[in-house]
A protein has these predicted regions:
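Conserved pre-motif I regulatory segment
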Residues: 1-37
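Conserved nucleic-acid-binding Ia/Ib motif block in the N-terminal RecA-like helicase ATPase lobe
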Residues: 5-7, 14, 62-132, 140-143, ...
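Walker A/P-loop NTP-binding motif
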Residues: 25-34, 46-63, 87-88
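Interdomain coupling/hinge region of P-loop NTPase helicase/AAA+ cores
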Residues: 70, 89, 98, 109, ...
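Conserved two-lobed SF2 helicase motor
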Residues: 116-130, 279-295
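Walker B catalytic acidic pair
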Residues: 124, 148, 292, 303, ...
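Arginine-glycine-biased low-complexity disordered regions
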Residues: 236, 253, 257, 283, ...
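SF2 helicase motor core recognition
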Residues: 291-307, 322-330
């Protein structure tokens, strides 16, 4: 590995590789195609960024609209997280990069591509649009990374991914990372990876030993929000998952009314709102994030101590991916599933398929000693999260703004000055 990349890792306190990094780096740095299987939080982002940057370092600059490397990810949040990890590595190697995703105007992205971006980090849909408009050309790609391929399949992106991979040169290096190897992902591997070396570490198919799994059997639906508020009021970061965007919005607002600084994350939010809410959660201004399943893959936040499934997910894969928000990189974490009487059968099937044996506790009301055990510490309810909105500086008293409507009494003052002059 180039010494300047080592220096970046040391600066960020990274001195020992995770299992997935130790397994894949020798092959990926040697230029081989790699299939890496590892759960979220296993360190796979650096497992593909390091060989990508090492391969491009010292090479020719990218031509306008023709990147040398492509990273595909399923969500805007994940693209931004990868961008944050890539930025210092790219700077050390003298590489430029450009993110490409929907939900924002395309003009800045087009400008970045025209300047000649070495690395493009993209969601499939917007990248296909820019290629169709001839703003991007993948014929010079040397290395392609497909991150969270199983999530791409879940979201129906595989046809677009196949078209994009077909647009990259045959024989170029390809790295594919996935928590599971489902049928759709397996088709990608067979079609686009040449004699791939397969490495598996911390598979999402197996129980996660670092997590404590609990099921709270609620006797009535009206206990759901009080129980959530009690858990979220404990010290530390909490991520709450719901099945629907409407549910995420409602839970976040009800937690806010209960004094919990909570933000929501789902597909109905504008990109600016998503960024603002994630930054509030990162900074600690909001201690609870309420998200939908789609957002589960894009949230990379350290020190999440508690994950709560306010709505049990529909399948075990979603349970494992949601739960991966805690116990990241070997840290401990607690996962709680709220279960209503009509959900007992589904939750039992879910946990059985996930390969876990949770501790189940029945709650006949909104309070129970188990809540303090699952989320220990003194409860704090400082109030709902209020987004920070920049305001213009106040003007000294008597100083005008140039807007007649904002200067009540100005005519009276003119009459007074005129009278004084007379």
């Amino acid at each position: 590995m180039p010494a300047d990349l080592d220096a970046v890792l040391i600066h960020h306190g990274i001195t020992t590789p995770t299992p997935i990094q130790a397994a894949t780096l020798p092959d990926s740095l040697a230029g081989r195609d790699v299939l890496g299987r590892g759960r979220t939080g296993s360190g796979k982002t650096y497992a593909f960024l390091l060989p990508l940057v090492a391969r491009l370092a010292g090479g020719p600059r990218a031509k306008a609209g023709k990147p040398r490397a492509l990273i595909l990810a399923p969500t805007r949040e994940l693209v931004r997280q990868i961008e944050e990890a890539l930025r210092p590595l790219a700077a050390a190697a003298g590489l430029s990069m450009q993110t490409v995703f929907g939900g924002v105007g395309q003009n800045p992205q087009v400008v970045g591509l025209r300047k000649g971006a070495d690395v493009v980090l993209a969601c499939p849909g917007r990248l296909e649009d820019l290629i169709a408009q001839r703003h991007a050309d993948l014929s010079s790609i040397e290395i392609t990374v497909l991150d969270e391929a199983d999530h791409m399949a879940d979201l129906g992106f595989l046809p677009a991914v196949r078209r994009l991979l077909n647009a990259t040169p045959k024989g170029s290096q390809r790295l594919l990372f996935s928590a599971t190897l489902d049928k759709g992902v397996n088709v990608l591997v067979k079609q686009f990876l040449e004699q791939p070396v397969i490495h598996e570490a911390d598979s999402a198919q197996s129980p996660v030993a670092e997590m404590d799994h609990h099921v709270l059997h609620l006797s009535a639906r009206e206990h759901r929000i009080p129980v959530l508020a009690d858990l979220a009021a404990a010290p530390g970061r909490t991520v709450v998952f719901t099945r629907t965007k409407h549910g995420a919005r409602g839970v976040a607002r009800q937690l806010g009314r209960a004094g919990i600084p909570a933000v929501e994350l789902h597909g109905d939010l504008s990109q600016n709102a998503r960024v603002r809410n994630l930054e509030a959660f990162h900074s600690g201004r909001a201690t609870t994030l309420v998200a939908t399943d789609i957002a589960a893959r894009g949230i990379h936040v350290d020190d999440v101590t508690l994950v709560v499934h306010a709505d049990p997910p529909a399948e075990h894969k979603a349970y494992l991916h949601r739960s991966g928000r805690t116990a990241r990189a070997g840290a401990s974490g607690t996962v709680v599933t709220l279960m209503l009487p009509d959900q007992v059968k589904d939750v039992r099937s879910l946990t059985r398929a996930a390969g876990i044996k949770p501790t189940t506790t029945r709650l006949d009301g909104p309070t129970h000693p188990i809540l303090s055990e699952l989320a220990p510490g003194e409860r704090s309810r400082p109030g709902a999260y209020v987004p920070v909105v920049s305001q213009p500086p106040r003007r000294p008293a008597g100083e005008g703004t140039g807007n007649r409507k904002s200067r009540p009494g100005s005519r009276a003052r003119k009459r007074q000055r005129a009278a004084g002059a007379r």
